[in-house]
């Protein structure tokens, strides 16, 4: 294992950091050249004047959420890190012989290396300590289910894509969940706690108001509804993570003996966003799946017979078949359908219905009056939905006259949508189909900015990775155009995402 580094984000604490966290590290005989203190530019001189000479002082950004993201970008993926707040006095563990008291940790180095060993044995990336400094609540055990990892002390392997933040006051809850979803667990050492002056010193999170906390808690609950509940006490409000959350199921279809690399990454992305995955298959050889997928089989990855929903006839066009298949599945079972070339980058929105969309031509002979139109990449509908039943009926009626081609069945679905008030459930195209089909090749090229065609501006690679919750990879076009998706540049959009999930 590469030796770990110690990272300390600090803001307006130059006058206490040396007497708190730095002094603790000195007491543990930690070499200062492995310590990195992240500060804002305006305070660099103040920290430089008080910190030990060998200590690394890095100019970062303001705001703990943005600073965490900056730290993640500063180090390589997989770099072992020990993150410490700047106000830590000491670390304590439950006394094995007398469990009515705690004793100071004897060797920090030993604690860190033993924790990384435990992470490796559980195939996890994030570990933390018990969040309350009270022997009464400590337990002489470790857990790997969903439990809060407080940001004061974290031992982890850096994952750049998991260090991006959308929350400020709840950033450590967000971190806990992102690593939990990606790995299937987080390691918490329930016999060790932290002695620090949390929420009482100047600096740190400056604008911690009740109103802002309420707003973040509500937004967090909406985003991660299955994984948490809101708790209130006196004049405070907070989040409580659920140890055994109820997982949402995504359903897909695959006809064929093997899956391709795009589908492999897509299925992995669904699992690493914490979903159960049910794939209806015909002829798939599960033994040829990548080991990263096989470990989920019969746990969160299940397979069912696709022909129970609808029979696939030899020689039949696969696209119109799969379109009708999904309508029939949703009408019979209800739930969430997702295309097997749709990679998830974040959680799906919690709303009654989901209908994804794609860009339309805004110039040329095929110019559309609409800037986007509904598609069927991700769909969420209730069982026995009237609109779906009408769509199925129309498709089956027209198929008696002529065999459907390419997108015929999707067009009938779009026609039925217009008759209903479903527009409010449309997902803006950049959130799932940010790179249009006419630019699909650029997904697999070393580009950060994509070509504007047909007067449609395409968001940048960084924007999509930060803001979109899915990415349609246009697998059908890659096959027809013989795109080498495995050999594509690692810095391409697809290459970047593939590295994240593998």
Model regions: which residues?
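Short aromatic/hydrophobic "clamp" motif used to bind/position activated sugar donors
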Residues: 81, 335-337
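Short, well-formed alpha-helical segments that are part of the catalytic scaffolds
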Residues: 8-29, 43-49, 258-269
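Short beta-strand/loop segment that forms part of the nucleotide-sugar
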Residues: 7-8, 22-47, 57-61, 276-284
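Donor nucleotide-sugar recognition loop
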Residues: 161-195, 208, 343
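Active-site-proximal specificity loops/subdomain of glycosyltransferases
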Residues: 38-84, 89-104, 285-324
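Glycosyltransferase-associated regions of secretory-pathway enzymes
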Residues: 184, 239-322, 340-502
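Active-site donor/metal-binding and catalytic loop motifs
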Residues: 185-242, 429-440, 471
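Conserved catalytic core of nucleotide-sugar-dependent glycosyltransferases
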Residues: 91-174, 347-415
């Amino acid at each position: 294992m590469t030796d770990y580094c110690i990272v300390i984000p600090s803001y307006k604490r130059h006058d206490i950091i040396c007497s708190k966290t730095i002094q603790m590290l000195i007491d543990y005989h930690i070499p200062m050249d492995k310590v990195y203190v992240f500060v804002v530019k305006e305070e660099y001189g103040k920290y430089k004047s008080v910190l030990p000479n060998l200590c690394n002082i890095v100019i970062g950004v303001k705001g703990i959420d943005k600073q965490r993201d900056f730290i993640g970008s500063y180090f390589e993926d997989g770099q072992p890190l020990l993150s410490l707040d700047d106000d830590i006095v000491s670390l304590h563990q439950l006394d094995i012989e007398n469990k009515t008291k705690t004793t100071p940790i004897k060797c920090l180095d030993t604690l860190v290396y033993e924790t990384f060993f435990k992470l490796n044995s559980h195939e996890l990336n994030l570990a933390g300590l018990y969040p309350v400094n009270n022997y009464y609540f400590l337990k002489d055990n470790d857990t790997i289910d969903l439990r809060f990892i407080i940001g004061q002390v974290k031992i982890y392997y850096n994952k750049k894509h998991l260090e991006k933040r959308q929350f400020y006051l709840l950033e450590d809850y967000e971190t806990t969940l992102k690593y939990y979803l990606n790995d299937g667990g987080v390691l918490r050492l329930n016999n060790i706690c932290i002695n620090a002056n949390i929420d009482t010193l100047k600096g740190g999170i400056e604008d911690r108001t009740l109103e802002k906390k309420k707003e973040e808690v509500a937004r967090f609950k909406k985003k991660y509804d299955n994984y948490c509940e809101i708790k209130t006490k006196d004049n405070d409000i907070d989040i409580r993570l659920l140890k055994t959350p109820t997982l949402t199921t995504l359903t897909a279809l695959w006809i064929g003996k093997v899956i391709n690399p795009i589908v492999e990454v897509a299925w992995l992305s669904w699992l690493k966003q914490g979903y159960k995955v049910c794939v209806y298959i015909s002829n798939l050889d599960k033994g040829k799946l990548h080991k990263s997928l096989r470990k989920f089989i019969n746990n969160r990855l299940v397979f069912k017979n696709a022909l129970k929903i609808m029979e696939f006839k030899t020689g039949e066009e696969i696209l119109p078949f799969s379109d009708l298949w999904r309508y029939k599945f949703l009408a019979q079972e209800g739930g969430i359908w997702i295309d097997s070339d749709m990679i998830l980058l974040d959680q799906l929105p919690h709303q009654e219905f989901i209908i994804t969309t794609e860009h339309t031509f805004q110039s040329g002979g095929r110019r559309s009056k609409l800037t986007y139109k509904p598609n069927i990449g991700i769909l969420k509908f209730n069982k026995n939905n009237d609109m779906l039943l009408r769509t199925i009926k129309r498709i089956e009626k027209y198929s008696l006259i002529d065999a459907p081609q390419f997108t015929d069945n999707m067009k009938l679905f779009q026609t039925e949508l217009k008759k209903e008030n479903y527009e409010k459930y449309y997902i803006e195209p950049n959130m799932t189909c940010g790179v249009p089909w006419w630019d699909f090749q650029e997904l697999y090229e070393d580009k950060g900015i994509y070509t504007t065609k047909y007067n449609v501006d395409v968001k940048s690679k960084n924007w999509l990775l930060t803001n979109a919750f899915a990415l349609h990879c246009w697998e059908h076009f890659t096959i027809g155009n013989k795109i080498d998706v495995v050999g594509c540049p690692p810095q391409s959009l697809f290459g970047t995402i593939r590295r994240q999930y593998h």
